[in-house]
Amino acid sequence: KKVRTSDGFIGYVQTNSLKHIKEETISSSFEEPQYTGISKDYKINMAWHNVENTTANGYIQDMLASTKSLTTIAPTWFHIADTQGNLNSIADADYVNYAHQSNLEVWAVLRDFHGGINSADETYEVLSHTSRRTNLIDQVIAAALQAGIDGINLDFELISAECGEDYVQFVRELSIKCHQNGLAFSVDNYVPMPYNTFYDLEEQSVFADYVVIMGYDEHVEGSYEAGSVASYGYVKDGIENALKSVPKEKLINAIPLYTRLWFETPKTQEELAAEAGTEAADYPNKVTSTALGMEDAEKRVQEAGVQASWDEDTRQNYAQWDADGGTYKIWLEDSQSLE
């Protein structure tokens, strides 16, 4: 029979050796800790602001002039400098002050790419060490408080399955530090798929104030076939799958304000032969693409002299035309597709 001693050792003894047997119900006084966060009493309308250098901080006025109804702006200010967890920051207090004067909160973005590190292995090197996580978190909080920032938006996109547990622990630790300092905390995520479950949306939702689903990149640069960046079905599935793990009041779906112009040409026999036995061989056309903003995309369609028509499957306006020895295809993001 399996037994345990009073000081916690577990083992087995023969049943016929037991004496003075009595049954007792053991209860635990353990109470699961409750994590309180920051919840806004309004709908979050957030825009990421890609800021690559300190000079670009001065463009906030121009950026806001072309927007409306925003509540939150998220400049890409924080990057991991090295595998020791040091921080590169281009945070700007004047930027924050201008945003506040425009009735906007500033949630600075912390990224694991486009900085000193730029690979899954390097991200793992940082997150797999408690001391390096702590170093990074302390520097992020200090920089945020110095600039008067209102929140942190975590955008780590180079997480491997091996790094999953360490990443989630980092989310826990950063969340606690943010809340201790009055900072809102949100986390960006890919559309949930079976291959990225290690991002652990359910555990994120315990600690993060908001969980953001990046509802785009259905087809990306390097895809084997042309397609929409964010078709209706893709976005809908992403939201519904996220809601299985995240409370609806914490979920934010991010939409693209860009699309891709695709160019297809038939593969030659030589190209098909070279790809034999690979996934690429299943696709008869060679495909390249260029990312375009909404206005530039509509301009390209007009310049081609074609009329886009509504595609019910993707719920987007679609156009294609032949030129330059191949076929151009584009699924537009416009006011109709965003409704």
Language-model-derived ranges and their functions:
Residues 1-16:
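SH3/SH3-like beta-barrel superfamily modules
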Residues 28-31, 259-338:
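Glycan-binding loop/region signatures in secreted carbohydrate-active enzymes
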Residues 15-61:
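Boundary/entry segment of secreted carbohydrate-active catalytic domains
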Residues 39-54, 64-67, 79-232:
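Chitinase-like catalytic core of GlcNAc-active glycosidases
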Residues 57-58, 191-220, 258-290:
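Substrate-binding cleft/loops of secretory-pathway carbohydrate-active enzymes
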Residues 3, 154, 253:
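Terminal peptide-recognition signature
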Residues 85-104, 224-252, 256, 291-317:
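Glycoside hydrolase catalytic-domain groove-lining segments
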